[in-house]
Structures are given as C-alpha cells and as structure tokens.
C-alpha cells in the first residue's frame, strides 16, 4: 500500500565516470527534479550524499543522491531516515531497471531487490525491511546475462537518454499524485507510457 512520500532517493554511483551511465538513471531523475525547482544537490556529510529540499504540492520533499557507491546506498538512506525521522515506507527510491525497456516507468511498493545492489543494501541496512516505494526507470536488458555489468555501467546512448528525459517529463505530470500516495491514476498513466 503506497504511503505519502516525504523523500526521494536517486540511486547511482558518484563521480564523473559514472554520471551518464545507465546505473545512474535514478540519480539523473533526482537532478532533473532539483533543477526543475531551481535547486541544486549539495554534499551533506551527515547524510553521506548530495542533498536538497524542494516543495511539491505544498509539501517539503527531501532529495538525496547517496555519494557512497551503489552497493553501499543503504548507509546514506538510513542516515536520511534517522536524521529527518522519515520512515522507510515514506521514502521513494528511484533506480535503474534492466527488466523494462529504456524510457519505460513502473511504480512499485515493496518486493525484493531483484539483483539490484542498491536495493539489496537498503533492505540490509533496514534489517530486511522491503516495504518501501520504488520508481523503476527502464534501461533495457542487453539480451545476454554476461553483458549486464558492462551494460549498466555503460554510458547512456543519445537515443536512450532522450527516452529517459521524456519519461522524466511524464513523471513531472504525475508527481503530486505520487507524493500524496494516490498511485492508482499515476500508475495507469505511467505504466502505459512509452517514450
């Protein structure tokens, strides 16, 4: 059951070598949100990440990009949860998703990590709690399991970046519904969207 969102975490790896990779799709959406609101993510040592606060539908929403590497994202999310007293169920985690086409969007509440190391570490740091919302940003599958690592760590092609950016603008349209926890309409629209 979706709850109101009080924070959005965009997963990715830090540094310029990873900035435009498929694995950083969540971080790219977070940067898009901050820019749209005239804000910038700034380093915050206590949160082990880059942080800013924006307003959506009159609500303060915390944005966090963990500056730990992907497989240590949980430490940063736990720091955010503890410092701002936000339950995990109110933190939307945006991440790249291999199993859906580039530019495709899926909202999901709860479930396993599906092999995603960022999700795996968040679940671990919260004592096995899997009950949190996810924004799954499609990056497509390379078609061969042996190519997955090079695919997710590879730079996003111009065509796929255009698809992701179209998806980000589609998300903008439904962000208030997502933030308020009213996912039914947002899911119907987002899940039928194709960039």
Swiss-Prot record:
Q: Which residues bind tRNA?
A: 18, 69, 71, 117
Give this protein's Gene Ontology molecular function annotations. peptidyl-tRNA hydrolase activity; tRNA binding
Superkingdom to which the source organism belongs: Bacteria
Keyword Mitochondrion appears in the UniProt entry: no
List cellular component terms (GO).
Answer: cytoplasm
Task: List the InterPro entries hit by this protein, alphabetically.
Answer: Pept_tRNA_hydro, Pept_tRNA_hydro_CS, Pept_tRNA_hydro_sf
EC numbers: 3.1.1.29
Q: Which reaction does it catalyse?
A: an N-acyl-L-alpha-aminoacyl-tRNA + H2O = an N-acyl-L-amino acid + a tRNA + H(+)
Q: Which UniProt keywords apply?
A: Cytoplasm, Hydrolase, RNA-binding, tRNA-binding
Active site, per annotation = 23 (proton acceptor)
Output the GO biological process annotations, alphabetical, semicolon-separated.
protein quality control for misfolded or incompletely synthesized proteins; rescue of stalled ribosome
Site described as Stabilizes the basic form of H active site to accept a proton, located at 96
Q: Name one Pfam family in it.
A: Pept_tRNA_hydro
Q: Where is this site: Discriminates between blocked and unblocked aminoacyl-tRNA?
A: 13
The signal peptide, as residue positions, is none
**Where is it located?**
Cytoplasm
Question: What does the UniProt record say this protein does?
Answer: Hydrolyzes ribosome-free peptidyl-tRNAs (with 1 or more amino acids incorporated), which drop off the ribosome during protein synthesis, or as a result of ribosome stalling.
Oligomeric state and interaction partners are given as:
Monomer.
Q: Which family does it belong to?
A: Belongs to the PTH family.
What is the protein name given in its UniProt record? Answer: Peptidyl-tRNA hydrolase
This protein's species is Hahella chejuensis (strain KCTC 2396)
């Amino acid at each position: 059951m979706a709850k109101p969102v009080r924070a959005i975490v965009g997963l990715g790896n830090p540094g310029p070598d990873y900035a435009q990779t498929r694995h950083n799709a969540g971080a790219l959406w977070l940067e898009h949100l901050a820019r749209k609101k005239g804000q910038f993510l700034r380093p915050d040592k206590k949160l082990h990440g880059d942080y800013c606060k924006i307003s959506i539908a009159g609500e303060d929403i915390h944005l966090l990009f963990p500056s730990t590497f992907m497989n240590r994202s949980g430490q940063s999310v736990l720091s955010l949860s503890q410092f701002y007293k936000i339950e995990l169920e109110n933190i939307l985690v945006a991440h790249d998703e291999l199993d859906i086409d580039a530019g495709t969007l899926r909202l999901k509440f709860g479930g396993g990590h599906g092999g995603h190391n960022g999700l795996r570490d968040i679940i671990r740091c919260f004592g096995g709690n899997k009950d949190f919302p996810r924004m799954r940003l499609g990056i497509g599958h390379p078609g061969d399991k042996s190519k997955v690592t090079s695919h997710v760590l590879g730079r996003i092609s111009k065509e796929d970046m255009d698809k992701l950016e179209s998806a980000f603008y589609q998300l903008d349209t439904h962000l208030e519904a997502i933030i308020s926890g009213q996912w039914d309409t947002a899911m119907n629209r987002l899940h039928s969207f194709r960039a």
